[in-house]
Amino acid sequence: MKTIKDRIAKWSAIGLLSAVAATAFYAPSASAHGEKSQAAFMRMRTIHWYDLSWSKEKVKINETVEIKGKFHVFEGWPETVDEPDVAFLNVGMPGPVFIRKESYIGGQLVPRSVRLEIGKTYDFRVVLKARRPGDWHVHTMMNVQGGGPIIGPGKWITVEGSMSEFRNPVTTLTGQTVDLENYNEGNTYFWHAFWFAIGVAWIGYWSRRPIFIPRLLMVDAGRADELVSATDRKVAMGFLAATILIVVMAMSSANSKYPITIPLQAGTMRGMKPLELPAPTVSVKVEDATYRVPGRAMRMKLTITNHGNSPIRLGEFYTASVRFLDSDVYKDTTGYPEDLLAEDGLSVSDNSPLAPGETRTVDVTASDAAWEVYRLSDIIYDPDSRFAGLLFFFDATGNRQVVQIDAPLIPSFM
């Protein structure tokens, strides 16, 4: 019996080791949507991205892609997130698969951080250049000091070609044209290898003798002063002197070779020009709002008043990059990411045209699997369970008005 048990244990161990070893031969590509891990309230109550467009879905190495649209800095900015006094327009992607050539807010070039005003809407444009082949999920993103990255909608872009074809030429202020992709690459490799060798030599010197147990015994015996000999001190001083000398000489050589240098530019750009949007002629009051967990749907009771001159209908509800549409009123033609677009996800109890001067209370339901897929339903577990978003109203000629809403959200488990 013991022999059988030993054989079972032996073959079980061999099988386990074989299975673990086999995993080394299978390494699938990682694919993830990082925005799902960001708190729902962050995506709902900070930056609202809309009217987005990606100029291309397939490019070759060295070709450019332009992302443009608008973003609204939500008036009900959460207290737990620092206000966007220092913000940076960024792009979320898996590493340097593209390089950013240009970034604009309000038509102004923004190579560094900017100050944004709460309650304002800005247009933006980012130009990217394809660097690495593959299928990449490219997001809009706003980095806020003290608030972290606020992720926006993302779209898959296919890059074709070979990375060896990539070029990133720039002309310096002295008139020299260089390729930043491989500029002074040999010099970079040399200094990395050089200081690595210095580090290995330093570690090698101190580890040439027994390291742990004998030295521990000497410390316990009260002979710690004997661990470092006079020769050790001389060698250490030699390493220190050589390091200082090399740094000084290398710096002097670099200053001589490149006499004209400009430091990296920092500081916060102010005076970003928001869009001058006309005040909406529609007012909306949220009477109550509930999220029905089993149905993956949010229901809102809205009181809508039309102060304008033409009848209007509700065509879209936007929150946290997810768009819920009433296809009878509005259809998307921008190529918005399909996983973030619920083309028939918006239903209104009475969505007949709301006449000028008329007030109507309606039940609005936004339903789609995106509530769970993108973890927006997690908002009901927050200590400040509030939702926020944008409502888009349209008249018969297609003119649009945007109204933001913000209200407590009550969960329903029935």
Curated annotation (Swiss-Prot):
**Subunit description:** M.capsulatus has two forms of methane monooxygenase, a soluble (sMMO) and a membrane-bound (particulate) type (pMMO). The particulate type is a nonamer composed of three alpha:beta:gamma heterotrimeric protomers assembled into a cylindrical structure; the beta and gamma subunits comprise the bulk of the membrane-spanning regions and the soluble regions are derived primarily from alpha subunits which form two antiparallel beta-barrel-like structures each.
What does this protein do, in the record's words? Methane monooxygenase is responsible for the initial oxygenation of methane to methanol in methanotrophs. At least in vitro, specific quinols can replace NADH as reductants.
Q: What is its EC number?
A: 1.14.18.3
Q: Which reaction does it catalyse?
A: methane + a quinol + O2 = methanol + a quinone + H2O
Q: Per the record, a Pfam family?
A: Monooxygenase_B
Transmembrane ranges, per UniProt, are: 186-206, 235-255
Per its UniProt record, the required cofactor names are:
Cu(2+)
The record's cofactor note says:
Binds 3 copper ions per subunit. Two of these (copper ion 1 and 3) form a binuclear cluster.
Q: Which residues bind Cu cation 3?
A: 137, 139
How is it placed in the membrane, per its record? Multi-pass membrane protein
Alphabetical list of Gene3D superfamilies matching this protein: Helix hairpin bin (1.10.287.710), Particulate methane monooxygenase, b subunit. Chain: A, domain 1 (2.60.120.570), Particulate methane monooxygenase, b subunit. Chain: A, domain 3 (2.60.40.1580)
Query: What organism is recorded for this protein?
Result: Methylococcus capsulatus (strain ATCC 33009 / NCIMB 11132 / Bath)
Q: What is this protein called?
A: Particulate methane monooxygenase alpha subunit
Q: Where in the cell is it found?
A: Membrane
Chain positions recorded as Cu cation 1 binding sites: 33, 139
